[in-house]
Amino acid sequence: DKDVPVSVWPEWELIEKIGEGSFGKVYKAKRTERGRSFYSAIKIISIPASKGELDSVRSEMNNEQSTREYFRNLVEDCIQEIYTMEHFCGNSHVVSFEDFKVVEYLDEIGWDISIRMEYLTSFMDYCTGKELTEKEVIKLGCDLAMALIYCRKLNIIHRDVKPENIFVSRFGDFKLGDFGIAREQAHTMSNMSKKGTYSYMAPEIYKGEKYDSSIDTVSYTHLRAH
């Protein structure tokens, strides 16, 4: 597939694109060892996202160095997601982080950030053509509650709890993922930004007011109501 790039890990072959959003594209990847196949999900975030974005920033900056620094700061922001995911290693209620690589372009301003994670089924795909059983609904609520409890222990606010950011393991466990806009609470209390999805967003966010980890509880409540 011409739309599937080459993996930065030679042993992992990108098979197909399985997701795309404002925080990058996600691919299913396969590694073959001793006749057995293993799978991972690899998210690739390109900064800048397009030549148009690069040209737009260039037109506003005084020089090439300022343009490079602007995008380098965005790279550091994205690496924040990786640091956030590392906090959750070993937690069964959050998507497991496995590895990452940052590759800087040689001929132009730009970076590709590859994040390798466990391969799971998206909640939206899991629900396609079926209704959740009462047992599954209860388990979904309990698993997400445990994920948010752990977030609170680490002073991390997810800020975008919604169906698209929930995943399901082959054992039927529900996991919270995509910490692309998550931040450690201590770093965001004095300078909060409006990020999240309006359908599940706490009023404090879209009103531009200060908020704390309770906003994830509000999103969780909205999610259960749906």
Briefly describe each language-model feature range.
Residues S96-G110:
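Short beta-strand micro-motifs within the conserved protein kinase catalytic domain, predominantly
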Residues R152-V168:
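Catalytic-loop of the protein kinase fold
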